[in-house]
């Protein structure tokens, strides 16, 4: 006897910082190289200004006339304008790859998320995933754009400025840089705490986004139950948590940034005291001291920017860790590829066979009946065969396992090996997309998209359907007349989740989406609940007349009366089976539900 828990997604290696950079940033190396050259030019021009200022001061201190330094002053102004032009170009060139990385990584992680299993989405809130794909990727963009820009500025200004300072007076350079070196030690110890607080902040933001998304999706339920105030209070509480974690990061920055400025001031004091002594001794000129102070001023910005860079790096690192949950999760696919054989559509095998299927929602563990289990079995030893063209009904109360069975057949939940077979082949060896193309599954909860009626019916088709195909599908779902009555017909926008349609129209539109695909098997999970008796009767006549195999679950006997046989589901087991006429005598509830 085979038992299976609902399995958690297994992990594979995800994108680390280096791998992410190689995948998304390295292909844009020519943009970064161009930005590198432009920033080098900016900083070289910038470092000429102190030298020109030194010339002006030295000339003026030796009694030169203003006319003697006019040309040098104009050169400084010209270099300033040149810096504006080159710096603007450098920002454009370096920021552009950041946007490209943002766009490419959003597409990558979104595409990756769409291929993940139901287990992943069960353990992650929709709002939290939206936050990861929006806010966290925005943090990566900030680092690979503004962060890279500032990092290059730091490297160039530090190397060039220190080289110029050392060429003037090596010992004074060493003494003036000691206070700035202290800052690197302080930031090194601050980095782990910044990373921890960044993770807490981005996790809290993900929870808040999830709360807000849930509220907007279920706003009618919240209002109908008078829970507006309590939901708002919960959101406010989580918003306060985001604020608290944000303030922790702010406190660290409030400590680091002023300290950087203060230490830069200490460096300038060192230059004034020690440099002044050297001027008095005749080993340095006044112009040299001025140039030194300008260089220290130039170094103040990149060292202050180090705090920004560290903050951006920590937030980007945290973002990549959170996105790594998406990247590491195992996508849908063949679970047993080594035993894969192609389904035989021409054989006399059952179209669908379920063999002693047992299942419980308990990720990561396989238990037997005698072993202690965290959750009860949802399905217990379910077995049946569905032949091509056969129509089977599932009758049972809520919680009897009908929907879970359908989710296992379509591999929304992963079934145990050797329990579900499609055309004689274990479904675990099939690609989920291949399997689902042959099975039309209408879920209890209708899912429509904010688009036109045409787009919703044609959803999932590789080719644009003809008008005749659309009309045939809509007619089969008993909604053609209503579509034609809409002002814009097939192009009518139905709003988010089909808000402009009634409950019955939503169900029939979703059914038309299945019928246009003409799958060999239809799985209908209580899809008639919002229909009146007349529409239900017409729709059932259309479904039974289409041919093909049918597996329909309902708590209304009228929907199952025409099935070849009915399985009675009780507490996850097949309690009985047979034709409607036989079972109705043993189960009066089947007749009462007609």
Give residue spans per PLM region.
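An intracellular "coupling" helix at the cytosolic face of ABC transporter transmembrane type-1 domains
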Residues: 22, 26-27, 118-119, 135-144, ...
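Membrane-integrated ABC transporters
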Residues: 1-46, 61-76, 90-94, 98, ...
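Cytosolic ends of transmembrane helices, especially the final helix of ABC transmembrane type-1 domains
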Residues: 204, 227, 251, 299-328
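ABC-family ATPase nucleotide-binding domain "signature/switch" substructure
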Residues: 437-440, 445, 456, 473-477, ...
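ABC ATPase nucleotide-binding domain helical subdomain, centered on the C-loop/LSGGQ "ABC signature"
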Residues: 107, 325, 349, 421, ...
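Helix-to-loop junction immediately C-terminal to a conserved catalytic motif
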Residues: 410
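Hydrophobic alpha-helical segments in the permease module
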Residues: 75-87, 180-184, 253-267, 273, ...
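Transmembrane helices of ABC transporter permease
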Residues: 27-41, 149-200, 271-284
């Amino acid at each position: 006897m085979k038992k299976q828990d609902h399995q958690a997604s297994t992990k594979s290696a995800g994108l680390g910082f280096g791998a992410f950079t190689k995948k998304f940033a390295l292909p844009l190396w020519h943009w970064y190289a161009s930005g590198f050259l432009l920033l080098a030019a900016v900083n070289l021009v910038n470092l000429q200004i102190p030298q020109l200022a030194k010339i002006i001061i030295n000339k003026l201190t030796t009694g030169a006339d203003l006319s003697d330094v006019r040309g040098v002053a104009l050169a400084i102004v010209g270099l300033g304008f040149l810096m504006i032009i080159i710096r603007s170009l450098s920002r454009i060139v370096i920021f552009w790859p950041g946007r490209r990385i943002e766009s490419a990584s959003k597409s990558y992680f979104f595409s990756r998320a769409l291929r993940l299993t139901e287990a992943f989405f069960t353990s992650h809130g929709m709002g939290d995933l939206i936050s990861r794909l929006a806010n966290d990727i925005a943090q990566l963009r900030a680092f690979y754009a503004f962060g890279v820009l500032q990092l290059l500025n730091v490297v160039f200004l530090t190397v060039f400025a220190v080289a110029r300072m050392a060429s003037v007076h090596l010992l004074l350079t060493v003494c003036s840089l000691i206070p700035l070196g202290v800052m690197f030690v302080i930031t090194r110890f601050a980095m782990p705490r910044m990373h921890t607080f960044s993770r807490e902040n981005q996790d809290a933001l993900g929870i808040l986004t999830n709360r807000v998304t849930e509220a907007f999706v279920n706003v009618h339920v919240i209002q109908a139950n008078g829970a507006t105030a309590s939901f708002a209070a919960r959101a406010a509480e989580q918003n306060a948590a985001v604020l608290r974690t944000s303030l922790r990061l702010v406190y660290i920055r409030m400590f680091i940034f002023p300290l950087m400025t203060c230490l830069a001031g200490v460096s300038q004091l060192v230059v004034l005291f020690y440099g002044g002594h050297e001027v008095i001794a005749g080993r340095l000129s006044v112009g040299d001291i001025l140039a030194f102070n300008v260089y220290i001023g130039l170094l103040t910005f990149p060292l202050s920017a180090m705090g920004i860079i560290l903050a951006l790096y920590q937030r980007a690192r945290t973002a990549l860790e959170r996105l790594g949950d998406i990247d590491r999760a195992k996508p849908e696919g063949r679970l047993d590829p080594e035993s894969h054989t192609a389904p035989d559509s021409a054989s006399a095998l059952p179209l669908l066979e379920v063999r002693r299927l047992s299942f419980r929602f308990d990720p990561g563990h396989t238990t037997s009946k005698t072993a202690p289990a965290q959750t009860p079995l949802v399905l217990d030893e379910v077995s049946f065969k569905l032949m091509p063209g056969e129509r089977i009904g599932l009758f049972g109360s809520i919680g009897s396992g009908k929907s879970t069975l359908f989710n296992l057949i379509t591999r929304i939940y992963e079934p145990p090996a050797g329990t579900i077979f499609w055309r004689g082949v274990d479904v675990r060896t099939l690609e989920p997309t291949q399997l689902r193309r042959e099975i039309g599954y209408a879920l209890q909860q209708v899912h429509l998209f904010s688009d036109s009626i045409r787009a919703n019916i044609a959803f999932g088709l590789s080719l644009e359907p003809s008008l005749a195909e659309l009309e045939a599908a809509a007619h089969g779902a008993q909604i053609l007349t209503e579509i034609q009555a809409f002002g814009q017909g097939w192009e009518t926008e139905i709003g988010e989740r089909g808000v402009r349609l009634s409950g019955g129209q939503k169900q029939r539109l979703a059914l038309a989406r299945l019928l246009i695909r003409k799958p060999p098997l239809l799985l209908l999970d209580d899809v008639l609940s919002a229909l009146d008796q007349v529409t239900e009767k017409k729709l059932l006549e259309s479904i039974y007349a289409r041919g093909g195999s049918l597996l329909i679950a309902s708590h209304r006997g009228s929907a199952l009366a025409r099935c070849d046989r009915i399985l009675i589901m009780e507490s996850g087991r097949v309690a009985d089976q047979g034709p409607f006429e036989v079972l109705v005598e043993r189960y009066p509830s089947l007749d009462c539900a007609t």
